[in-house]
């Protein structure tokens, strides 16, 4: 476990070593720290897109974890994620040498010192919403710094050190580490049961989110989605200034007159003073993304920015990689990849996909974590209502040990039991999957790959499979 003191001031060290630097969150923090002139090194078990990004920027990354690495780089501080066990040889050596060990979120908090910090949290939607916020501020010429758990399209990075006064941070609730942050404005998109490997249940999750919302202080603002009235009540229980947003007239900021044109969404946002502003989102379809955009415009409102200029800037948002990302087309089949790995995310994405006019919406889903599948199996089974065909591949463990009986085949059986008319296939190998897809998916269909694991490779592999057969 990392040292527990909260970071409330700018970093006073000169060098930092990141154990597990290849993750989406860790790599962004390391990149921004490097861009600010600190000496940054890191290590991870294997190379990745994020590590290649860091290497190009000039960060030295060791592949593999060895105690000797700590002796070599002699960092002033070591940064770890909760995925790093106490037995990690680099962590053990750092402790032996008395080097301070910081959790990822403490370093994130330190990087936000001296900035107006906007922190975006929620069970779903936080990566897209924080990316929208960073894009809006940047396209308004405000040059924000940002740290986000995904690659922001148009910037090709998950972290950026800007010269402006604003700092946008995706706040991770998965291990309560977002409690290290010191935000001025908070967005909470939703609160649901998830990460039950860390939390005892929804009550503990809600209590932790309430603590997080309290971090803004009495002069801050908490922006919450009013589609869940209980979330609004939870936010107001903190005694902080709360603004709710949503489609219902009861909200402080109202999303009105939604008009979906393919993947483009047009709508109106009305503020408390009655002023109305037209908004256009050219990527990331669906009502849930209209809500995300409304939350971001509310940030502009709270910061005293010109709302029409903010809406125009927001219209240039190009999306986030692995959030309804177009992979390619082959034989009249459109292939899209999406990170959705929780039932609510899946429902929202499929609702958006079903409105796009494809002949069929066919899904390849890879459950992420045995604990999540065990806790939410029935919810997963119901989440695929808008999928015409469902293909399941083996669980991506994310480092968890298997739980006896908790498998993708179990989920397939549950879907069949609850929805007998649904076409469901479990595939035990990628070859079997490609063969099934070849038979099941046709011209005019949307093939949607979903999950937080390596299911992202399914789309490109299927395109290569069909291309090779055509060229043979």
Q: Which stretches of residues belong to each language-model region?
A:
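N-terminal leader/targeting and accessory segments in enzymes
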Residues: 1-103, 107, 229, 254-257, ...
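Phosphate-binding loop of NTP-binding sites
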Residues: 8, 32-35, 55, 69-70, ...
